[in-house]
Amino acid sequence: MKYTYHLTIPYQDVDASRRIRLYTLENYLLNVAGKTADQMGIGIPTLLPMNYTWIITHLNLEMLYLPKHNEEIIVETWIERNAHMLSVRDFRIYQSQQDGSQQLIGCAKTVWAVLDLTTREIVNIFDHEMFDGSVDGEVLNMARAARLRPIQLDNLEDDTEALQAGEV
């Protein structure tokens, strides 16, 4: 099932160019995900009595346009799949046009897990009844997020000799 939210960009959420700040847009998506989970009966108010909470493990966002102050965006969201203790939630972001149409300006993919607050371990609760019928199944075609390679710290002590005071 898909859920849709209409949001107007307030002045405090834009930067000096009057466009929405990227981290603010990401917060919008997280808030929409939380509201949707609450409406589906799988939100934090449902999970906390079981001593569980949602955590986000990945967020991949692609934008063609960053909306400006006072522009309306429409965020459409759905659960792509629940598998292997992870839930994949997708988003499409549209900009409202003056003629009433909507233009696709971005998309996002998030990956979530449920954390046991006592053991601090990720748990599989997707076989519970509360998750029946929550998956829409539509796959959002997005490029996979790049993986960052770990920084090699070998021979770090040797490299520090080249630094002078005040260079860092």
Question: What do these predicted ranges mean?
Answer:
Residues 1-168:
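Terminal targeting signals and extreme-terminal segments of soluble enzymes
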